């Protein structure tokens, strides 16, 4: 079994760099891209599960339809016992709808052990789900960013890049990415949700 993850910048690891050279730039060189992917939340989930990892997270406004296309391009690489986790992006980055994106991804992966999370914006916040199976969607109205915000309130520790706290004046919702502690915190959330069901 392997952990295979798909998602946007929240899965890729955007926000990890300490270098001002890469802050605000979604398309780094290969070295920086590997650094991000190897230190984002999927790494720590895979370590907790004791299985290998393939992190397919992408930056540059990578939307849910883009996630679908990336999965489709790589179907031949997936193994029947892979654990697949999708962290959904902002639902309106592509010219598709949340209902269509969710159904297309769920149909594509119907024969796999898969689970869905929201990265920073609830996929169905602005649209009612129609005839969809949410049995594999973990907390459809909650996001990784919500979890980090709630954790910050309890610990008074910043889990976002540049040591910013979520929700401070001047910081727009969804405009922050996790720092290393934030990605580790997300991995705890994901692992705790999955450990009893997979």
Where are these regions (language model features)?
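Alpha-helical cap/lid subdomain in secreted, periplasmic
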Residues: 71-198
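Glycine-rich anion/phosphate-binding loops
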Residues: 66
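Serine-esterase "nucleophile elbow" of acetyl-processing enzymes
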Residues: 1-63, 76, 178, 185
């Amino acid at each position: 079994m392997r952990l295979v993850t798909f998602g946007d910048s929240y899965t890729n690891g955007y926000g990890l760099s300490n270098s001002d050279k890469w802050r605000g730039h979604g398309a780094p060189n290969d070295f920086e891209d590997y650094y991000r992917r190897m230190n984002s939340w999927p790494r720590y989930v895979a370590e907790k599960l004791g299985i290998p990892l393939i992190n397919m997270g992408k930056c540059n406004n990578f939307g849910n339809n883009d996630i679908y296309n990336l999965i489709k391009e790589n179907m031949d690489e997936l193994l029947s016992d892979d654990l697949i986790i999708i962290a959904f992006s902002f639902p309106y980055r592509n010219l598709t709808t949340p209902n269509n994106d969710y159904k297309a991804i769920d149909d594509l992966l119907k024969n796999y052990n898969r689970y869905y999370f929201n990265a920073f914006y609830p996929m169905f916040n602005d649209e009612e789900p129609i005839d969809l199976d949410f049995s594999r969607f973990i907390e459809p109205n909650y996001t990784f960013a919500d979890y980090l915000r709630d954790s910050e309130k309890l610990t008074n520790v910043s889990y976002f890049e540049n040591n910013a706290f979520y929700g401070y004046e001047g910081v727009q919702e969804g405009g922050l990415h996790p720092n290393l502690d934030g990605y580790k915190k997300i991995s705890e959330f994901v692992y705790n949700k999955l450990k009893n069901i997979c």
